[in-house]
Amino acid sequence: MYVAVKGGEKAIAAAHALQAHRRRGDDALPELSVAQIEQQLNLAVDRVMTEGGIADRELAALALKQASGDNVEAIFLLRAYRTTLAKLAVSEPVNTAEMRLERRISAVYKDIPGGQLLGPTYDYTHRLLDFTLLANGETPQLSVSVAEQDASPHVFSLLANQGLAKAEEDTGSTPDDITRTPPVYPCSRSSRLQQLMRGDEGYLLALAYSTQRGYGRNHPFAAEIRSGYIDIEIVPEELGFAVNIGELLMTECEMVNGFVAPENEDPHFTRGYGLVYGLSERKAMAMALVDRALQAPDYGEHIAGPAQDEEFVLAHADNVEAAGFVSHLKLPHYVDFQAELELLKRLQRERANG
């Protein structure tokens, strides 16, 4: 017979101490500093910031260190800390067209105003292990030059000017805030994009991949992917004008998708949109693909795949919520299991007795 297993504070404290010891590792080796994580594991920091909802590289690096490199645990830590922060102001909408570019590519036009800029990327590597890194080699040297950045309008604005795509218009409405108001379905576009930005990268990547394999009407081209620094401004009440409070490294992706032919409009391309912190390019692309898939009802398209089901996609995208629900199965369920056990034994006795 199953009985309750008793534990206590001492056992829990010992478990935490053991975890801290494993996190530190061999104390004969130098401890990994938060600054090293921030600078040298920058893509992991970008993901934790994006899905954790705080644009603070030091805090994201600290969370990664505390979580022993577990991204989901680090995201959980950052989300928990976020709930303790006061909301001091709301920033002005960012203008990504004025981004100080680090990288900009387009898969639909070779020559675009402002040009293409490869920037930092793993795209053209051979994916072979670099064993020289085991020797703690020298810092890579870069040649430095000064260049003027030409105006770099969005590729979608060029399509819109030709009547090939609809221009996005600011309605002036206040965006939803999913940190203050729980999402409901169907939800607004602003709520959807916020949930996708905070959604798990692997989950969104799988859904985006599914749209390319026929589970949803989606034939995309990467109209533009741009990464760089964006100015952040707020308007203090006592001043009444915008004040620059810093800049953020962000990545934006716009996917141009198959065209539609509405009755009262000219046929035009549709778009999917993604925007994330840092250089999380894969996440931005997946977000843009899923965003377009979720627009299926807006265009009267048949729902043919899971990526087009808004409630299914968004209700399961949050890895903190998902990990919490799955992890709760580790908690004691002795009474529940005892009930199942007694029922099973009774059914076996009834079958044995005919």
Where are the language model's segments positioned?
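Short, amphipathic alpha-helical interaction segments embedded in low-complexity terminal/linker regions
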Residues: 1-227, 241-243, 349-354
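Acidic, serine/proline-rich low-complexity intrinsically disordered regions
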Residues: 143-354
